[in-house]
C-alpha cells in the first residue's frame, strides 16, 4: 500500500493513504532504521499493517530533496519574500533561487508579500524589479493581487505538491491561511492523529488540500549554498539557459572572454543586480 509522509515526530510518522485518503500513525521497519534511511515530509512510502500497527517498509525514489526546509518530492516551490519589514534583499532572494534550483526544483515561483506597506516611490522601484525577474523567466506573484493570485496558486496545488518557503517574518503563514481558510481545523486533526498539542510551524507539515498537497515549512534565517562555482553558475536558470552561446563550455561568467551572459547584462537583458549578486556568491564560494 502507498502513502505520503505528512509529518514526522521522533520515530513516529503521520501517513496519508493515497487510496483511502485516510491519515494514521506508522513506524519504520527495523531494517530501514538499521540502514540509516532518513524519512522526511513529502516522501512516498510503501507500508503494511501488522497485528498492532502500521509499518513503513520501503521509501520510494525521490525526484528531489531539500535539506532546508527538509522536504521531498516537490512539484512547485513558492518562495515568499517580503518587500518591507523585513526589507527586500535582492541578494537574499537570488541566493534562495540558486539554492533551490540547484536541487532539481523545476518550478520555482516568487511571491512578494507586504506590498501594501510601500510608498509610491518604493512601489515604482519594486515594480521595476518585478519586471526584471519576469523578463528573466520567473513567474512572480504579489500580495496586492490577492484574489487573482489565489486562483493561480489553487490551480498549481491541484494534483501537485506545492511547498511554501521563506525567511522568518516574511508573511508565509499569512499567505497560507488566506489560501486555506480552515487551516487551523486541518492542523488540529493532524495534531489529534499524532496525540499532541496544537501544531506550530517549527517543522515541515504537509496538508492534503484541493486534490493536492501544501507543505508549510518553518521560517529560517540564512542559507549556506554548499556548492561549487560551476554548480552556482548552473543554478542561475537564466544563465544556464543562455550559456550555450558563451565561447567556453564551462564558462563561469566572471572574467572569461566572449561571455554571452555578461553581454546580456550589458544589454539589460539580464537584471544587473542579479548578476552582481551572483559575483558576490561566487567570491564567497571561492573563499
UniProtKB/Swiss-Prot annotation:
It is an enzyme of class 3 (hydrolase). One of its GO terms (molecular function) is GTP binding. Zn(2+) binds at residues 246, 251, 253, 259. Its EC number is 3.6.1.-. It holds the Pfam family RsgA_GTPase. Its cofactor is Zn(2+). It is found in: Cytoplasm. GTP binds at residues 113-116, 166-174. Gene3D superfamilies: P-loop containing nucleotide triphosphate hydrolases, Probable gtpase engc, domain 3. Binds 1 zinc ion per subunit. GO terms for biological process: ribosomal small subunit biogenesis. Residues 63-223 form the CP-type G domain. Keywords: Cytoplasm, GTP-binding, Hydrolase, Metal-binding, Nucleotide-binding, Ribosome biogenesis, RNA-binding, rRNA-binding, Zinc. Its main location: cytoplasm. NCBIfam families: ribosome small subunit-dependent GTPase A. One of several proteins that assist in the late maturation steps of the functional core of the 30S ribosomal subunit. Helps release RbfA from mature subunits. May play a role in the assembly of ribosomal proteins into the subunit. Circularly permuted GTPase that catalyzes slow GTP hydrolysis, GTPase activity is stimulated by the 30S ribosomal subunit. Monomer. Associates with 30S ribosomal subunit, binds 16S rRNA. This is Small ribosomal subunit biogenesis GTPase RsgA.
Amino acid at each position: 500500500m502507498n502513502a505520503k509522509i505528512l509529518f514526522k515526530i521522533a520515530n513516529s510518522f503521520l501517513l496519508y493513504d493515497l487510496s483511502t485518503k485516510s491519515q494514521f500513525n506508522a513506524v519504520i521497519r527495523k531494517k530501514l532504521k538499521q540502514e540509516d534511511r532518513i524519512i522526511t515530509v513529502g516522501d512516498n512510502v510503501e507500508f503494511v499493517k501488522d497485528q498492532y500497527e502500521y509499518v513503513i517498509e520501503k521509501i520510494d525514489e525521490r525526484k528531489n530533496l531539500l535539506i532546508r526546509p527538509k522536504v521531498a518530492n516537490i512539484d512547485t516551490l513558492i518562495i515568499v519574500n517580503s518587500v518591507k519589514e523585513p526589507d527586500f534583499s535582492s541578494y537574499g532572494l537570488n541566493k534562495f533561487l540558486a539554492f533551490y534550483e540547484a536541487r532539481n526544483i523545476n518550478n520555482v515561483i516568487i511571491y512578494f508579500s507586504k506590498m501594501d506597506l510601500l510608498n509610491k516611490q518604493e512601489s515604482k522601484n519594486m515594480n521595476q524589479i518585478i519586471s526584471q525577474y519576469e523578463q528573466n523567466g520567473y513567474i512572480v506573484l504579489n500580495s496586492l493581487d490577492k484574489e487573482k493570485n489565489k486562483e493561480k496558486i489553487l490551480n498549481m496545488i491541484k494534483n501537485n505538491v506545492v511547498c511554501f518557503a521563506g525567511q522568518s517574518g516574511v508573511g508565509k503563514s499569512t499567505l497560507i491561511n488566506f489560501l486555506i481558510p480552515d487551516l487551523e481545523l486541518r492542523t488540529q486533526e493532524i495534531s489529534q492523529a499524532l496525540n499532541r498539542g496544537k501544531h506550530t510551524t517549527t517543522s515541515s507539515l504537509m496538508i492534503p488540500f484541493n486534490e493536492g498537497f501544501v507543505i508549510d515549512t518553518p521560517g529560517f534565517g540564512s542559507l549556506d549554498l554548499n556548492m561549487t562555482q560551476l554548480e552556482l553558475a548552473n543554478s542561475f536558470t537564466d544563465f544556464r539557459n543562455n550559456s550555450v552561446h558563451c565561447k567556453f563550455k564551462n564558462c563561469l561568467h566572471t572574467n572569461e572572454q566572449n561571455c554571452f551572459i555578461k553581454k546580456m547584462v550589458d544589454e539589460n537583458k539580464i537584471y544587473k543586480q542579479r548578476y552582481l549578486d551572483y559575483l558576490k556568491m561566487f567570491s564567497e564560494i571561492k573563499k
